[in-house]
Amino acid sequence: MSVKHFIQITKPGIIFGNVLSVAGGFFLASKGHVDFALFLAVVIGTSLVVASGCVFNNCIDRDIDHKMERTKNRVMVQGGMSLPLALIYATLLGVAGFSLLYVQANPLSAFCALIGFIVYVGFYSLWLKRKSVHGTLVGSLSGAMPPVIGYCAVSNSFDLAAVTLLVMFSLWQMPHSFAIAIFRFKDYSAANIPVLPVARGVLAAKKQIVLYVLAFVLATLMLTLGGYAGLGYLAVAAAMGLYWLYMAWGGYKAEDDSKWARKVFGFSILTVTALSVMMGVDSQTAADVLMTYAR
């Protein structure tokens, strides 16, 4: 056991992706008036909560991770950390993260983090991931919480913008996850995990990917139409979303499903990154947007 194991088991890549969306929500609510001390506390607090959830997930999935090529080298599978130590580590990370959000931000942001944590660890990892084709749908709620946490840490209000962020990022999770399940089809089959491509076929997953990307595109526009983001954000959201939709539609004539799914997955990362950045740099008040439309 080494320091490397303590880092690896938290899934740093997932933490980094969540930090981007936290920042997007935070700067969207800040509207150019950024409290950097609060920002740092929110980023660290959310990262600790996400890390905690990932460690618990590693503990829960250790019996199926060894069956999958993608996860067979994880710390718990390789015996790099004992189960009791991992559980203690996960608990300490969670307590630290929730406490930081509650004390340095506000109870609302801590509550949002708690909901995401319960959904991911309890409903998804412990239950639905292994039992239901709808596990991805339920799990998407946890993946959508980080931008909401960032937004509520500033606004201290679960308003229309928070709802829009929750819907946007939940919808984004679905095609993103289905694409992974397609190009990792053999892994999920070997572990007997009933993701949509395994349970109902790749064609069914392709149809769902197109529908969810379309819904995502429409949802992204609501931040501008609702008066929370500017026209620059709108232009980027529309361009990225429509190209992602075009790419998703291409799945119907793809000769290599795995190659196509990897492209859809890769562009999903670019899309959510671009939107997170634009939410921060082009946030504005409803009055600003209305004045722009009126000119």
From Swiss-Prot:
Superkingdom, taxonomy of origin: Bacteria
Reactions the enzyme catalyzes: heme b + (2E,6E)-farnesyl diphosphate + H2O = Fe(II)-heme o + diphosphate
Subcellular location: Cell inner membrane
GO biological process: heme O biosynthetic process
The protein's enzyme class: transferase
Record's GO cellular component terms: plasma membrane
Annotated EC: 2.5.1.141
Main location: membrane
Pathway: Porphyrin-containing compound metabolism; heme O biosynthesis; heme O from protoheme: step 1/1
The keyword Cell membrane is annotated on this UniProt entry: yes
Membrane topology: Multi-pass membrane protein
A GO term for molecular function: protoheme IX farnesyltransferase activity
Keywords: Cell inner membrane, Cell membrane, Heme biosynthesis, Membrane, Transferase, Transmembrane, Transmembrane helix
Bilayer-crossing regions: 9-29, 36-56, 83-103, 108-128, 135-155, 163-183, 209-229, 230-250, 264-284
Note: Carbon 2 of the heme B porphyrin ring is defined according to the Fischer nomenclature.
Entry similarity comment: Belongs to the UbiA prenyltransferase family. Protoheme IX farnesyltransferase subfamily.
Function of the molecule: Converts heme B (protoheme IX) to heme O by substitution of the vinyl group on carbon 2 of heme B porphyrin ring with a hydroxyethyl farnesyl side group.
Name this protein carries in UniProt: Protoheme IX farnesyltransferase 2
Annotated gene: cyoE2
